[in-house]
């Protein structure tokens, strides 16, 4: 049976019975997505949703949606899990975990408030004029936010959409061909909750191909007030080329991440954390560990313990399906490393691959839970492989060691320093790829105080004409 993906415009599922369709092949299954028309583009670009919600109403709506996702019997959740397994090759455990995380994010009311508080300085600034310095300041939405989503990490799309919702922007969401399910399921759950809610009505979800005629998609891109682009270099270049010149583009492009193991006393705890950071999303995420740098004299013990923990993850979070080409790349990498006489171990049925090699000797990286481990003496042997704008996450075990290295790592380009085993949890208050995204989704408006309002440095009213007439400007210079 062919899976049909709906077209959602303004929170309404469109009748696409007369639309042409594009066939996507996912995990050897066919998915049909409607090809957007001129009429669709006109509906999207002309849509204007009045959002007078305050932050409390926004968070409460998201919480209500999250409670639906929390129910293991929610039909939308069940369908989503089946789609991830059938079409994206996720193991049932991975798919269930993804749905669990959607519910966790939506139901974490305190975290949603704190995201706004930390990024924008106050959770009230999106609702009220706040006194700041000699002004009153308010953060208004940019307007129409276009989200060009990637398919490797479904939760990145959820995060992108929630950031726009928290800042009261409309969402025009272009799904990835690899994952046309997540954004559609999320928007559909909004419809299930309240079809007439302003947040629901501000959601439009569709797909178009970058490699075909983009005349109609370009009309949609031209209406953007802000663009959020996720994906590889080609996706980021496409977004840059096709976005209006005047709009801000938040670029979440390709990154790499590493783990540092600093002579741990608890070898097992260190291995558990590193195994998690290798296995989560099968290394498809920017934050996934690909290289491990070990400092200390128990590398062999750690290597053996890490293989045990990778085998445990094979059971508790099984790897997703691999294509023929992916299996071939995995086997080729293994043979290349064996030929180079590196220490190599792999799990049954290509569950994982661990290779010990000297620092700086990087072979192919097929991902799919394959990692290189390098023995180094100190941090100076690691910093050459930390690249500005490339290295995202550095996970460190034991955690206490991070305080020794954070200044050095940051100065060499690392964007995020975490405890091993926490790579998929972006802590509230932290930056994302070197930025605070919500700040770039709003427009700050300043209402400045009048001339009679004295400043800290000048305790008289500001009478500029008088200063010029009497040539007394310098009298007031502090």
From Swiss-Prot:
General function of this protein: LuxC is the fatty acid reductase enzyme responsible for synthesis of the aldehyde substrate for the luminescent reaction catalyzed by luciferase.
The EC number(s) this enzyme carries: 1.2.1.50
One MF annotation (Gene Ontology) recorded for this entry: long-chain-fatty-acyl-CoA reductase activity
Keywords of this entry: Luminescence, NADP, Oxidoreductase
One annotated GO biological process: bioluminescence
Originating organism: Photobacterium leiognathi
Pfam families: LuxC (PF05893)
Protein name, as recorded: Long-chain acyl-protein thioester reductase 1
Source superkingdom: Bacteria
Swiss-Prot/TrEMBL catalytic activity: a long-chain fatty aldehyde + NADP(+) + CoA = a long-chain fatty acyl-CoA + NADPH + H(+)
Family statement drawn from the similarity comment of this UniProt entry: Belongs to the LuxC family.
Pathway(s) where this gene product acts: Lipid metabolism; fatty acid reduction for biolumincescence
